[in-house]
């Protein structure tokens, strides 16, 4: 086995060295023909054997020439033969041309080349802004090699997503060259651990080359794997809003003033006053806020469009009953202001859209807006998105909006705000009762809030999403109440029982054990921030009366308490008192994001607590 693995990686090393040369279509190697599996991502359905990009950048546009060669490894990989090349079609400022390609099969040791038929290349409209070139390779099967080339031209040369080295399938070799003939000043932004390690201190590079790149789906602890993938961006020292071009000296201020001015065209406090008056006030500000949320949720719906600038007035929105995120949040903001709340509208980039680069005030970094409401005399903030309101847990905004920072839409200087998440809480109580009639009964009650609950939750699997039962005994369900919201948490009650044999022993395991197994840390040179979905706290208690004739054996090393300077904390303890066995477990992850240099500290902490969670408690016959 060692020899086989060594030979596989030797092949990859030889292959990638060969691919450092320019990719020439129609000339495939024995290594490419014989490749059936990617050693560093063995479950891959297809692999990019080699790809090259060359960009000619001028002061008015750019031309990107792409060459790519892919091998199909499994039946699922056949989808890679369907190609879609998107481009910005409005005003015809972008285009894709020069598409050529072919399928290569080896039949009886001879190359069989089937070219793409130009008549089978289609130009399709995706929406009012974007179009795409679509084509499908002919005669494709498992083992086929497909290769294609095209040229993308664009007049949008102020903020360019120049080249992606990492894709949704692994890549053996990826090369990008830049020929900068522009007169203006441009910054090269490299994203990804591989690029930033290899080209650290080489800011003047015009050629980049990476080998053996895992698919971005393999990236762990990132909100948006594609956004955090290995790639190069090219950024001009200017920005555009609706055709305007401005220097970066006071660019953020200018940008937000432009946005705010467009909002002023749609703000109409007097028109919304009557609407606000018809929404009843509650006994306190929280109840009033909930009444406003109920009104928005009942009267307008999201049309599935994200936007940073409204396209409808409040009156039109209420009449049409459907609008974009910008339309809906403007209405929410205006009503709350009329009800006496202190509010702000914040422009942000959602997790699925990508992170903001603060050094470059570009409006297309943002894709939506949200509403921030101050409560308790300004001591607490509630983050709301009118398009995705949580009527029961108003303090927990949509998870997708929590992507570091946003910028307040207002007059004056630019003001960035951090979008902080509230801690989600999970409490579970498991009580085992060994009955004198030979039955074992489990009474379980779980309470949870925040992001431990979502609308897509499967009622049958609510209790199995995060915790397992402590006794590995098959129980028959007796009571399985529907999950209900009570005051500030969701509550689930469950009862099950079984007839048990007169077993010599029973083993109590840690209910959090399986959940903790997902936390693996395998990066060797992490340079990305570590992003967890949300901060949380677990509080778990297992209880059981000790049956007559049995005793509980607790290892003296079972008790554990681990705490880090980062605030993470884990505690477990087992004890016996007055004939009852109790197991207590707590786990706190206080923040959603940690800096890259904390990776090893996090790794060590999780390895410790995973080891602790493997410990068991034995209840055996005396």
How would you label these PLM feature ranges?
Residues 131, 157, 255-261, 271-281, ...:
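Glycine- and acidic
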Residues 536-545, 549-622:
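C-terminal accessory domains/tails appended to large, multi-domain proteins
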Residues 129, 278-374, 393, 544:
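Active-site neighborhood of thiol-dependent amide/isopeptide-bond enzymes
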Residues 19-258, 330-333, 343-520, 527-531, ...:
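Beta-strand-rich, non-transmembrane domain signature
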